[in-house]
Amino acid sequence: MAEVHVIGQIIGATGFSESSLFCKWGIHTGAAWKLLSGVREGQTQVDTPQIGDMAYWSHPIDLHFATKGLQGWPRLHLQVWSQDSFGRCQLAGYGFCHVPSSPGTHQLDCPTWRPLGSWREQLARAFVGGGPQLLHADTIYSGADRYRLHTAAGGTVHLGIGLLLRHFDRYGVEC
């Protein structure tokens, strides 16, 4: 079986109006992919930017996959949350990006968005917090369902990813 090693980090985020940010992340693959080592999902620590608007997380990602086919290439899905002084968490944005398919190091910028909801939900978000959230996480990367949503742009999550490919030549795939 061909193997893919994804090694890197979620560096941080910029462009969010909220402070005290953290990121929940996960990786989604097709049925032909098997996770050999690493964890499929995780969460960063909370960071409050002191200078500028960059929240730094430097959260490690280390995944090792085996695959029988290229369908369902791995993609990272991200949820950025903010935490207020009372410890309440509110969604700041959803985003996703495909893991690059070429070996080497890659700097990825993942734009985020959040659902707007009705004007009442927007007003409640401004004064009380909270706001609408997706019921199913796969809507983040499923374009068919996403087009019906009214959304607002969030910030950008920055990732540094290193990719190693092994035994792809045995299966006729040139990298």
Swiss-Prot record:
The keyword NADP does not apply. Disruption phenotype: Mice expressing reduced levels of the protein in the central nervous system and kidney develop perinatal triventricular hydrocephaly, polycystic kidney disease, lack functional intact cilia and die at the time of weaning. One of its GO terms (cellular component) is MKS complex. It comes from the Eukaryota. Residues 2-118 form the C2 B9-type domain. The keyword Cytoplasm applies. GO terms for biological process: cilium assembly. PROSITE patterns: C2_B9. It is found in: Cytoplasm, Cytoskeleton, Cilium basal body; Cytoplasm, Cytoskeleton, Cilium axoneme; Nucleus. Highest expression in thymus and skeletal muscle. Also expressed in spleen, kidney, lung, heart, microglia and liver. Detected in brain (at protein level). Keywords: Cell projection, Cilium, Cilium biogenesis/degradation, Cytoplasm, Cytoskeleton, Nucleus. GO terms for molecular function: gamma-tubulin binding. Belongs to the B9D family. Component of the tectonic-like complex, a complex localized at the transition zone of primary cilia and acting as a barrier that prevents diffusion of transmembrane proteins between the cilia and plasma membranes. This is B9 domain-containing protein 2. It comes from Mus musculus (Mouse). The gene is B9d2.
